Amino acid sequence: MLKNNEILETISMIKEQNLDVRTITLGLSLMDCACEDVKVLSEKIYDKITKTAENLVKTGENIEKRFGIPIINKRISVTPISIVAASCNCNSYLSIAKAMDKAAKEVGVDFIGGFSALVHKGFTESDLKLIKSLPESLANTDIVCSSVNIGSTRYGINMDAVKLMGETIKETSLITPDGFGCAKLVVFCNAVEDNPFMAGAFHGVGEAEKVINVGVSGPGVVKKALEEVRGKSFEEVAETIKKTSFKVTRMGQLVAKEASKLMDIPFGIVDLSLAPTPAVGDSVGRVLEEMGLSNCGTHGTTAALALLNDAVKKGGLMASSYVGGLSGAFIPVSEDECMIEQSKNGFLTIEKLEAMTCVCSVGLDMIAIPGKTSASTISGIIADEAAIGMINNKTTAVRIIPVPNKDIGDIVEFGGLLGSAPIMRVSPGNCDDFISRGGRIPAPVHSLKN
């Protein structure tokens, strides 16, 4: 039986501490749309998305009204387009991206992901077509998101893909305002198939025909809970985070089950990730500072983040039988008001953020760098992050934005959930010769599991 104080606590979490469901994401297979004619394929994709997702937004709104739980985004993820379009006789997949964009707008969702390729061991012709289509596709669509998986613990890092993605990010930044197209492009190592968060979501080939995945949020709730244990031991800190994560995940489970029932689509997973926003009171950085750091980014930050990430998982696992996605704590610089501030103050650098990615979800996320940064330097940043993921058997990623005509200390405004970011310093050295070697970095010895 529910107690009055538990009901009031939940209301307080939603009204005062920015607790919300960050996204309901419909994962959708497009395998049955395959066709040699790219025009016919685009039409099939449009028809399938609009038919399957026609009630997604309405369902989310109904759940919001019924339970009083804010659901910030409704999204769609689809099978990686390089697989779906492999039989097409064409040179570019721009028309497919436009069909995805049009369909997503028709059903009213915020983003659609899956304009993606999986090239961790090598390229197919279709993979290369998709990657070469990325700059114009991101420039000519509004809500299409893309991802490319360039490495894995099992197979190593495809350095040819790393080089190509550095060049692709650079080109995309030059043909989209303030490099904004790069905010819709993620480069992964060890990408997961059931991620509900953008821009890296795609519907994996091992997934069902269609599925509902939910991503929760709630850093403000965790910070409020930690205020009650100031000065206490780390055991109490971890226990407090675990209990809070359980409550947050339970809410996500409720929303996922309800959406699944209303849409008659199987429930997939709840992603436990703490996802910040630029709003005050909704920051992962402030959670770390609440543990006793004067500034997010100072010494001790990586340890605090490791504790947070692990405790979130332990608490969330007890609240749902199906936990998946990325599940941890996100550190997107432009989307976290504390990290924006500490980047301006010099406490958060790319090097420190890279260290933090060793112990949390994903990687270098929503980081703005000078527009003059070379493609090979971007590739070097991707390679470093991929190496962390490969060696540690975890998902890492890079979503980095070279901003044309901006330099260190300038500010770029993206707006909405994407926030704003100071232009961060990159190393003045170069890695041109390293990146130009090509080939594949071999998988680590612990990849041999059999």
Swiss-Prot record:
Signal peptide: none annotated. Pfam families: DUF711. Homodimer. It comes from Clostridium perfringens (strain 13 / Type A). InterPro entries: UPF0210. Belongs to the UPF0210 family. Disulfide bonds: none annotated. This is UPF0210 protein CPE1497.
